[in-house]
Each structure stands twice: as C-alpha cells, then as structure tokens.
Amino acid sequence: RRAIRRSCGLSCGIKWPNDLVLNRKKLCGILTELGLEGESGAVDYVAVGIGINVSQTSEDFIPEVRGVATSLAQALTPPPARNILAAAVLAALDDMYASFPAAREEYLKRYRAGCLTLGRPCRLLRADGTSEEAFAED
C-alpha cells in the first residue's frame, strides 16, 4: 500500500488476507512464505511474491475477472513507470524488514486500519468446496 501511495498517489484498501483493492477492484495480489529456524524460532527466510496490475486495460482481463480487476493504467494517465513502482515496492519491503519484529504492532495497526474486510460479512470457503457465511472479526 505504501509503495503505491508513494509512487502513484493512490490509496488502496486491503481485502483480507493478501489483496490490494482500488475502487472496489483487485489491483494487486501478494503471496508470502516465512521459514523459521527450528530451535531458536528466528526468521530463517521470507519469500514474497507481489503481482501489481500496471498497464492492463479492462479488455486485457479475461471476461470472468473484468468486473473485479483493475490496473494502475485504468486509474492514472499515464500509469507509473515500472522501475519507479518497483523501486518503491523494494524500499517499502526493505523498511518493513529492517524494523520487524520491533514494529510488529505498528504494522498490525496499519493493516487493520486499511483492511476493508474487518467488521463485514464474508463467505468462508473450505478446501472441500463447501462454504458458509461468516463475519470478519479481528
């Protein structure tokens, strides 16, 4: 969120747990993996995959996602240069990594403040294909 705000001037919301949303449409997806050292519990590695829709028009998305996906090009003319956006993402990740875990509570506070899902009804999808209505609580 910080990288997009700093490089583009746009404010995104978070759709729990790992999507960034702009104008009620998915702009970005984030996947993470964390490895801990067995005995100490210290962080061994963090792998982060970030996909930001930068230059797509609505026609570039397959019909099934056109109504729920967006890109920076649809919000800004011109869209940001990819190198500027990538540098902003790397700087934000660097800042977060350098201050974690000391700033953990601050990150959780920011996440909660930006989360569009908390306090709202949602649908819980299970691995077996079943689902049920739920309420997103902190």
Which residues are covered by each model-predicted region?
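Short loop/edge segments at beta-strand edges and connector loops
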Residues: I14-W16
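Long, positively charged amphipathic alpha-helical accessory segments at protein N-termini or as interdomain linkers
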Residues: R2-C12, L22-D138
